[in-house]
């Protein structure tokens, strides 16, 4: 068998509302989650609704580049 790129890759999900609003004095930072995705099943960017401890609500977290 040919050895190519790994099918499962590690991705970092970042809160889109924290990034959009910018890190102001009220916000202490930007929420990030680390997870894995199957490159064959989801070739596009991954977006999940996760809890952001800085926004105090569930927001959309998008995949970022490493």
UniProtKB/Swiss-Prot annotation:
SUPFAM superfamilies named among the record's database cross-references: Zn-binding ribosomal proteins
Superkingdom of source: Eukaryota
Gene Ontology CC terms, in alphabetical order: chloroplast; ribonucleoprotein complex; ribosome
GO biological process: translation
Principal localisation: plastid
Pfam short name (any one): Ribosomal_L33
MF terms (GO), sorted A to Z: structural constituent of ribosome
Keywords for this protein: Chloroplast, Plastid, Ribonucleoprotein, Ribosomal protein
Compartments it resides in: Plastid, Chloroplast
Protein family: Belongs to the bacterial ribosomal protein bL33 family.
Name this protein carries in UniProt: Large ribosomal subunit protein bL33c
Recorded name of the encoding gene: rpl33
């Amino acid at each position: 068998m040919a050895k190519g790129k790994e099918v499962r890759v590690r991705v970092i999900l970042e809160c889109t509302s924290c990034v959009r609003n910018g890190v102001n004095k009220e916000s202490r930072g930007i929420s990030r989650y680390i997870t894995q995705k199957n490159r064959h099943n989801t070739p596009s960017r991954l977006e999940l609704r996760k809890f952001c401890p800085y926004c105090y609500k569930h927001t959309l977290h998008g995949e970022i580049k490493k």
